Amino acid sequence: AQGATHHANSHFKILDEEGEWVDSDRLSEFAFGKLGEKVPQGACRRAPANSKVEWEIHYYPDGNAVANDQVAVGIWYYDEEDGFNEEEAYRQDLRAYRLDGGGDYMIPPHGTLMTQGFHSFDHPVRVDSWQPHMHLRGVAMALEMFNPETGRREMLSQASNWTAGWNHSHMYEDGYQPLIPAGATMIIT
């Protein structure tokens, strides 16, 4: 099979107190089959002053680089003339919230495995998009919220009959983004 970019992730690097380059916030994330991502109105990703961008790219199916491969990211800067107000904007978090374990799983032929990951925030969160990603063996993924104040568990998104060529970042429409209250738990299954 011909090789293709499987992941192309970029993040900012900043200088620490000792003058060493260290990782900072993620800039973008790409997975095979993803069409791109859009930052919603009123949101931002901050580019630290004097930072640089580092790429982490790997290839599928054999891990070998693809000759003449090109990966790009576009950055738009906004300021007061654009009507952008940094104090009112909320900062997007592109962190990958993984399933527990994060290691190798032993799945027998024709077998199944179900894993879950949990994450809570100490502040309210608006979910702008959700991207299931399970490589070759995954068949379904769900994003739920458990609210300890109500004792209710709510399904936010689900992808069933999943395929590895379908790594789209599912964007919620304006006004329909799930709101997760402080202390609630996201459940990824």
Predicted regions, residues:
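Beta-strand-centric surfaces of beta-sandwich/beta-rich domains
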Residues: Q2-R126, Q131-T189
